[in-house]
């Protein structure tokens, strides 16, 4: 009656961080995707890619595009053809959406892009500086502990994420943006947001958790979530970066109308039974 998993084929999650560093080219990722993941979507593709290449034309590789769209890597390479007819390879990553304001999102993008430019010159081949297993572990820590994480950095250095941001990442990002001739005022504006966020030890996730914990002590779960959502909408529209947001108060929401709630939205589920 018990199923043993010791000898079953290992399957990778379609939502994943990755398994190892790339060694030679992006083809390694596409090969892995084709081998490890079953086809979910298909269609009638008439294109003969090899024939097009032999005549100097650029294939759309529609089947590859569709299959790639069903595998959700943290950094996903996407093949496409630009409006000018030239093929390109772009990288989709999950850094940009973690605002919650537009200013925070652009600051995140500036930090990431600046670091990518400068670390190429400062570090070179990062595979010689840090193992993929440590990077994978850091990713898990960041997802679980956020701004309170402690990472394994290059050369096996242990460093809190705030210290890493202030001492390593932000200075490198500033230099990288300068190398790409970004206006000094823009560099200061966006890097100051990241620096203040680290100094204040506050980001979107931490603000939401602290706010919910505070409100939950003062009212029901439903009203706490309603006030929290309202506060997030108001703060987001203000354009003020998240590290400057105040903790929400119940009085911030002028009208709370729970009369239309379902039983499941206000009932208590934490019960003692005998």
Task: List the predicted regions and their residue ranges.
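Generic recognition of stable, solvent-exposed alpha-helical segments in well-folded globular domains
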Residues: 25, 66-69, 88, 103-114, ...
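A generic short alpha-helical patch detector that favors 3-5-residue windows
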Residues: 85, 165, 255-259
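C-terminal catalytic subdomain
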Residues: 89-160
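Tandem CBS (Cystathionine beta-synthase) repeat/Bateman regulatory domains
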Residues: 195-274
């Amino acid at each position: 009656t018990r199923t043993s998993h010791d000898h079953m084929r290992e399957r990778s999650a379609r939502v994943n961080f990755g398994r190892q560093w790339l060694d030679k080219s992006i083809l390694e990722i596409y090969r892995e995707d084709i081998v490890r993941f079953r086809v979910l979507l298909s269609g009638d593709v008439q294109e003969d890619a090899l024939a097009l290449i032999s005549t100097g034309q650029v294939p759309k590789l529609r089947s590859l595009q569709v299959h790639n769209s069903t595998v959700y890597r943290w950094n996903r390479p996407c093949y496409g053809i630009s409006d000018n007819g030239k093929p390109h390879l772009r990288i989709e990553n999950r850094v940009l959406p973690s605002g919650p304001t537009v200013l925070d999102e652009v600051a995140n993008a500036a930090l990431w892009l600046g670091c990518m430019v400068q670390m190429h010159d400062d570090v070179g081949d990062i595979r010689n500086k840090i193992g993929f297993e440590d990077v994978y572990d850091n990713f898990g820590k960041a997802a679980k502990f956020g701004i309170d994480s402690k990472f394994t950095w290059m050369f096996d250095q242990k460093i809190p994420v705030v210290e890493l941001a202030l001492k390593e990442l932000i200075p490198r990002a500033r230099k990288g943006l300068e190398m790409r001739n970004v206006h000094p005022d823009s560099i200061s504006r966006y890097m100051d947001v990241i620096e203040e966020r680290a100094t204040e030890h506050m980001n979107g996730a931490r603000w939401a958790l602290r706010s919910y914990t505070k409100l939950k002590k003062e009212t029901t779960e439903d009203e706490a979530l309603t006030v929290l959502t309202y506060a997030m909408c108001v703060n987001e529209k203000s354009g003020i970066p998240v590290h400057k947001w105040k903790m929400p108060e119940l009085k911030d929401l002028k009208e709370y109308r729970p009369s239309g709630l379902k039983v499941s939205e206000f009932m208590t589920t934490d019960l003692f039974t005998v």
